[in-house]
Regions:
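Hydrophobic targeting/anchoring helices
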Residues: 117-122
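Ferredoxin-type iron-sulfur electron-transfer modules and their immediate structural context
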Residues: 1-102, 106-110, 114, 125-136
């Protein structure tokens, strides 16, 4: 988490710290998935996906573009990009779309904006997720 640019603004990290989860107790069973940096404004790091489906629903219901979907079942379930090539660059998603801004864990990141909020000023740096007024 400390090296992730979503650190301090990640809901999963905030909940894990609240529950005092500090080390992994089980072997990770997820395969190493590629990073998609094909889009001019966005990067997808599929390895961070927790399968919450927020981007899938936002893309379908709010943006009406159906850019994302989940594929597979059980442990093979994973996020995919709905394009012929499977690359984000071959979709009509923009950085302003709801789907590009809804990810709670940093799967979808904006290029040229990394680490824009300094340490100490991030969402969960001063108040825990439990203390936040606007948590969902």
């Amino acid at each position: 988490c400390p090296s992730c640019e979503k650190s301090g603004d990640c809901k999963l990290q905030a909940v894990a710290y609240q529950l005092e989860v500090k080390t992994l107790h089980f072997t990770q069973l997820f395969p190493d998935r590629p990073v998609d940096a094909s889009h001019p404004d966005l990067v997808l790091d599929f390895n961070r996906c927790i399968l919450c489906e927020l981007c899938v629903r936002a893309s379908s219901e709010v943006d009406r573009k159906n850019v994302f979907a989940l594929s597979g079942r059980g442990i093979t379930k994973h996020l995919i990009v709905n394009s012929e090539s499977g690359q984000l660059a071959d979709t009509d998603i923009t950085a302003a779309d709801k789907a590009a801004n809804v990810c709670p864990v940093g799967v979808i990141l904006h290029k040229r904006r990394g680490f824009a909020v300094p340490i100490g000023k991030r969402r969960y740096d001063e108040k825990s997720i439990r203390e936040q007024e606007d948590h969902e």
